[in-house]
Amino acid sequence: MAEPRKAGDEAAVAGSDSGGLDLTNPRHVRALYLDTLGRTPDGDELELAMSSRPSMLLRLLCGSIGFWQHWYEEQLYYFLLLDNFRPHDPGPGQRLPDLLAAGEISALEAVRATVLSSAFHRANPGNDTFVSVVFEQLLGMTVQREPALLEAGKRMYDGHRASLWGQSGKSQSDVVTITCDQPDFAERFLDREYSRLLGRAPARGELRRWTAELRAAPGDFPQLVIEWLLSPEYSDRLQRLRRKSNRQFLQGLFVDLTHRPPDDETLERCRRALSAVADAGPLRSVIARVLLGGEHIDLPGRDDLPVQDLVVHVFQRFLGRQPGPNELETFITIFEQCECETDTLVRAVTTHWEYQYY
């Protein structure tokens, strides 16, 4: 297992198969789950996915409660509403992911509700900071180039009647509402969501088409995500490894090892620890070792499978691929000479750099 060849935040996949989305390839299934649900599939989900058609699987995933929970966490990260700035939990049935999954609100309405929250106000105090962040994050605007709009927004924030894009208001909620009424709001939202999922900017013509579609049918955001993930551009993305976010790494690690996601308290505690260091890679490996040592992991025993099949099983389960010839030979040799157990192989894989990518 060689060191990665990185380009930005990506690393090349050695020997990956060319072509489109292939659900018989466990790495493709793992990538879909990480992108849509923020975690890897458990064994039953992987088996079901590998016997499904891509469009059928994506209809099952996109728009599910798990999809919206992951999407919402990504929005909180984008707006830096973390830890003490996290929005108040209104309780089951009233959380934004619950309302989104029930079709009671749209993604654009959920973004607006997030920016209207008291948490967003606490995280961005003062008229200059608040208005600048709203314009920049919702519209992609460079406020230094629009001083008149910035000043009008600040007056409106302070309770004085002012006009933005021809609409009048006199409160900070008016600043947000008027900003969300602009056509660039939907376009900026789709631009960043496409880039988040595919790791590249969308074609301008396609972005304009999607924007028009979403403004006409605000509830159709999951259908756009399905279109993106079935596109040749996503298949191309799968030829490159992308680094997992801290949440993706933690949730995927727990599902891979224990077949269940971590509880909220454990997830947030580990996420904060990873976010506190400049390079989270070594600490990610420590968390993997600790989890392996402290949990009952359902793994085939040393004598349950021929050693070659055991090595292949570990690579497919945790990396979604077959081991290369040199990897297979090395792992077999170490396993036989050291008389170790299967968890030693798992530790080697889950603490390696490649496991931190997908």
Outline where the language-model segments fall:
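Composition-driven recognition of low-complexity segments enriched
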Residues: 2-358
